[in-house]
Amino acid sequence: METTTHAQMGLLDNLITSVVTNDFLQQLDKTLDWNPIEKTLQAMYPATTGRPPCPPLVLFKMSLLQHCYGLSDPQCEELVADRLSWRRFVGLGFQDAVPDETTLVRFRARLRGHGLHEKLLTLINRQLEQKGFILKTCTLADATLLQAARRAPAKDDKAKGNTKDGGDKDASHTVKHNQPHYGYKAHVAVDKNHTLIRAVTLTGAHVHDSQEFENIIKGDEEVVIADKAYCSGKHDQWCVKHKVANGILRKANRGQKLSESMVRVNRLLSSIRSRIEGVFGWWKRSAHYRRVRYIGWIANRLELEFKSICWNLKRLTTLSATT
């Protein structure tokens, strides 16, 4: 009887596979080689502890869905259970139990514990580079503000170091366009040709864009383009040292105006640099990433890593379909 049941379930899985489709997930599953990712994830589980109760690649794929669509842990669990195309993508059969939210929480903790909160994007990008989508001809740099998951602590609480009922010790204040912000800032470098994210860092909102320039620009590109916030003698020297063409928009010296030719150059560079805004627009509109979901830098750094991977995988499926 048990054998018959398993056979029936196998037939049902095959039937589902043949009729349930999600173009994005189908294309992604075919385009990306999951083996090196699975190997990296498996290394988090020592052989002495035995086989993990849930395959880590299943949890990784669930995390991708979660961050791609801006879902909470319970929402992700519910939708994977409900949507057959999502089950198929993550690698669960019709009869398989869906990992619960606690399992997702433990998985993220394990990723952070093994330092993968700053390494997963590089792992994905190796494949994008091998496929010829990251060309390194030109890198665009910019930053965007992210609201904290909690409100800013009251002044009295801050003075006492009490953030239990509000605030995040790693978030900070800044003002942009005369509007106060409390939270974080994502610093991003994008390969111009296909607008793929090459590097990201996360800081408190108060950190100036220019301070993360050398942490996100790799020095292997031919040109770097960034807005006036990055204009400084230090960065000019960095470009010379690394033999990278300097496309940082120029600022006028105090009491002087930019020449007409420099204004035209700035306008041209600005039109190219604006491509990076597409990343921020997708994050905030589609991935619901106007604010961070967690408390503390390391948890939110992992979230930024996943959001960046999701953007690149979205772009990968589009690029693969047109080449």
What are the residue ranges of the model-derived segments?
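RNase H-like polynucleotidyl transferase catalytic core
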Residues: V244-E260
